[in-house]
Amino acid sequence: INCRASLNSCFHNACVANTNDENFSHYEAGADHFVNLLFTFDEKEELTGAIINVPCPSQNTENEYYLSADYWNDVRIAIRKKYGDIYLLPQCAAAGDLAPRILHYKQAQDRRFRLKYGESFAEKGLERTARQDIAERIAAAFDEVYAWASKEKKREARITHVVETVQLSKRLISDEEYAYAKQGYAQEMAKEYRTDGDPQERLFQNSVLYSLRNRYKGIIDRYEAQKEQPKFPMELHVIGLDDVAFASNQFELYMDYQHRIQARSPFVQTFVVQLAGQSGEGGGSYLCTQRGFEGRGYSASMYCNLVSPAGGQELVEETVRLLKEIRASQEE
């Protein structure tokens, strides 16, 4: 699980960029090595499934056009090979600034894959081999944790589920950004959709044009609405299951926010679940930290952030508040 954005000495970040650069300084984010697991059993105490919470997006295979569960498909294969056809529920923990690929030491990784997998590496290629490698590491974590976690099976558990709509400070659009968006929107609206040529090329080019128009239009709409609506409503779910908790958000949430929540949570384990909630254009945007915002990468741009870093901290505070309230009610 590695950083998504790198920072050069000019203090400007780039997403998944080449780090073999004389201006490369450091990675913007750190890394989160925790895999949170919750196992389920039947009345005979036989394993029936597990929740696997990993702070890493399932986007190892990119720039290919087919439906795929990415490394989660490989995870299911690896775990079910040993434990049978159990149910596995993947969760993506906060990982807005993390990615399932390394950004330096690539030659060393190639050598490892070549020696570890042999001809299979040549047949599958880098990306699919990396998926298999990730799956094997998650499966190894599953084995290790199951060996001791299975000693503490619970037949009863107190469950508390709280849902609140929290109001988060928006990422406001400046006058300059508004003017830029209006100009860009006018330019894209002056272009016409293609109606001839190869269908695949036509679909691609028309999709790009449609996307660019919507991108600029979204900025214009946000600017015009933000004076009367400076807050962004988000449906927050927090669940207490004895000494384990789950807290959702709808964003690609930067890692630091998760650590702030987990560090202050009164529960033994707190599963943070990102991209859980509203779908479509109103959900799933990045929520960067102040550090990310200042780095000016694409995931911190006006297009990709509906909520500001201040709103991100508000999400932390609201989540921690509910976690503490639920834990206190369980102890009454």
State each model region's role.
Residues 1-332:
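Non-catalytic substrate/cofactor recognition surfaces at enzyme active-site rims
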